Amino acid sequence: MCKINKPIINLTATAARIKGYRLRCGYSVREIQAIFNFNSAEAIYSWEKGKYLPTIDNLIVLAAVYGVTIDDIIVRDEIEIECELDIRDEKSA
């Protein structure tokens, strides 16, 4: 058995950053909706509430609009998981 740290996205903190950058840049939800040419603002509200993440394409657009990088938007955490196979033993073989 081995234990490794698996990177994950902190959805709640990422949602807060998405909303924070929008507010800091002075955009309304409707303006972001127009930039994406969405029929409704539901997706933006869902991103900002942490219901789900934007697609990678939409993250690229958000980063460009807000003048930041995708790494600035996404909050990364790690969780420890157990492996059935000890990958350290495999690497040395």
List the model feature ranges, each with a label.
Residues 57-72:
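DNA major-groove recognition helix of helix-turn-helix/homeodomain DNA-binding modules
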Residues 22, 33, 63:
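The alpha-helix within a helix-turn-helix
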Residues 1-24:
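A short, Lys/Arg-rich alpha-helix, primarily the initiator
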Residues 2-8, 64, 74-93:
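Short, charged recognition helix plus adjacent turn
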Residues 26-46:
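Short alpha-helical DNA-recognition segment
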Residues 19, 30, 60:
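Residues within the helices of the helix-turn-helix
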Residues 47-48, 58:
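DNA major-groove recognition helix of helix-turn-helix
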